[in-house]
Amino acid sequence: MPVLSEDSGLHETLALLTSQLRPDSNHKEEMGFLRDVFSEKSLSYLMKIHEKLRYYERQSPTPVLHSAVALAEDVMEELQAASVHSDERELLQLLSTPHLRAVLMVHDTVAQKNFDPVLPPLPDNIDEDFDEESVKIVRLVKNKEPLGATIRRDEHSGAVVVARIMRGGAADRSGLVHVGDELREVNGIAVLHKRPDEISQILAQSQGSITLKIIPATQEEDRLKESKVFMRALFHYNPREDRAIPCQEAGLPFQRRQVLEVVSQDDPTWWQAKRVGDTNLRAGLIPSKGFQERRLSYRRAAGTLPSPQSLRKPPYDQPCDKETCDCEGYLKGHYVAGLRRSFRLGCRERLGGSQEGKMSSGAESPELLTYEEVARYQHQPGERPRLVVLIGSLGARLHELKQKVVAENPQHFGVAVPHTTRPRKSHEKEGVEYHFVSKQAFEADLHHNKFLEHGEYKENLYGTSLEAIQAVMAKNKVCLVDVEPEALKQLRTSEFKPYIIFVKPAIQEKRKTPPMSPACEDTAAPFDEQQQEMAASAAFIDRHYGHLVDAVLVKEDLQGAYSQLKVVLEKLSKDTHWVPVSWVR
């Protein structure tokens, strides 16, 4: 067996150990692991570095002098004053090079052990009580980013104190600045008698590093853990337009339906949050859920928010004479059960009773739209497919999209078979085109809230039941339904996990046409009126129900809308989506 000498290094020891490893049937994995570790080049390099450092410690070298730079300058003066020969001229040139001067400066720094920064001395005219307080000097490197802290003047003591630490900012990452700390100096400038806006300007103008002289708070607050709560915003927010925010520059703007990561709820009025997917690591201020609800309640009481009556059905939801509810569901030679033109587009009158009250209950007590807590969700194999809900404005023609999707893949997609009190025709089959029931049975189911929505056409009742939707989903098919937006609240449950798609027609700008004869004026007017109605209906749905929507499709033509819808449906079972947190708990 080889013997190590006293001068053998660690890397030589590792090499010897590797060669001495012998196969062992009982410890194959352990032996293989050791062989891999000992053979790693990076470990060998580390051992060599370790040996060099140990050798340096044993030698314990001391510098010959502590001022090599000064010596070099003296030599250069002598060379410049004396008669210059070729060797002297070369030496003078070498001593003048920036690289050699830098090496000499590093030598002096190491020799003098001048590693720590020199702190500025305390001023002579210091307050008497200042000596008794613990002063902390904090130096932060913040580049061009904000400090990530807000300040205010204490009403009682008049001191400038740290009011808030923004999560993810330079101050938060340092862990050295806390809420309640008193700020005395910024880069050597006393701030005791300066206004907060002047101090903020000094902080903003400081580039690279910034030195703060602070007095720690008497009761230093513990650093709280991030809450990691995700919220979907149900409203637009611009801090520049918010007079109540304590610091507009610290505010976080966001759009409706944007997902926010709330990292701090310490303040009951102003939360700290980040936009999911944003590269900016610093959090910003947003109004808390409770504070925003109080503001909306106040505005509603003051009459600056829409009244409950304004949420009732607008003029666009009127009968469409061009479509009826008895059209067959044929497309490309295939018959698809349950497909028919929507009875909602026929002459519809809501029946009275409990269902009417249920459908209008949301209009009587409209909720205050602030935030909705959400979580990531991905469809798992063996799990029932999510319900796909289509809502559309005037001119969306949702039934065409449903027909095309189901006809293309009837094994994967399906539609709910509606109920009707209309007599069955000779070519119709029970449970295929419709579920044919008596008026008494229909009204009984209506009384027990079994219908998602219903309508009346030519004295016959039509409706879509929740059981019909459940029957399609039980077959492991994706059920497509098109409903009025009022029905969304009833469908947004963990049972259905609906994915809501808003389909709206492309609104063309008013076309410029040459002057027309009086005979043509009547034919041009309906075009503009129809465009206005379509735009108004889309705006109404977006205003009152847009916060519930997961995807928006703009329909210019059937094929284009179908292509968009197909992409959305393909991603539905593959991608991760944000859903209400109650759906996944």
From Swiss-Prot:
Record's Gene3D superfamilies?
2.30.42.10, L27 domain, P-loop containing nucleotide triphosphate hydrolases, SH3 Domains
Provide the PDZ domain boundaries: 137-212
GO CC annotations, alphabetized: adherens junction; apical plasma membrane; cell-cell junction; plasma membrane
Instruction: Provide this UniProt record's keywords sorted from A to Z.
Output: Cell junction, Cell membrane, Membrane, Phosphoprotein, Repeat, SH3 domain
Compartments reported by the entry: Cell membrane; Apical cell membrane; Cell junction, Adherens junction
As annotated in Swiss-Prot or TrEMBL, what is the tissue specificity of this protein? Expressed in retina (at protein level) at the subapical region (SAR) adjacent to adherens junctions at the OLM, and at the OPL.
Cysteine disulfide partners in this protein:
none
* Residue span(s) of domain Guanylate kinase-like: 385-570
Q: Which PROSITE patterns does the annotation name?
A: GUANYLATE_KINASE_1, GUANYLATE_KINASE_2, L27, PDZ, SH3
Q: Which CDD domains match?
A: GMPK, PDZ_MPP3-MPP4-MPP7-like, SH3_MPP3
Cite the SH3 domain residue spans from the record: 226-296
Q: Which residues carry this modification: Phosphoserine?
A: S307
| L27 domain segment(s) | 6-60, 61-118
Is Magnesium given among the entry's keywords? no
Q: Which domain of life is it from?
A: Eukaryota
What biological function has been recorded for the protein in this entry?
Answer: Participates in cell spreading through the phosphoinositide-3-kinase (PI3K) pathway by connecting CADM1 to DLG1 and the regulatory subunit of phosphoinositide-3-kinase (PI3K). Stabilizes HTR2C at the plasma membrane and prevents its desensitization. May participates in the maintenance of adherens junctions.
Query: Which family does the record assign?
Result: Belongs to the MAGUK family.
- Its quaternary structure? Interacts with HTR2C; this interaction stabilizes the receptor at the plasma membrane and prevents the desensitization of the HTR2C receptor-mediated calcium response. Interacts with HTR2A. Interacts with HTR4. Interacts (via PDZ domain) with CADM1 (via C-terminus)Interacts (via PDZ domain) with CADM1; this interaction connects CADM1 with DLG1. Interacts (via Guanylate kinase-like domain) with PALS1.
Q: What is this protein called?
A: MAGUK p55 subfamily member 3
- Please give the organism: Homo sapiens
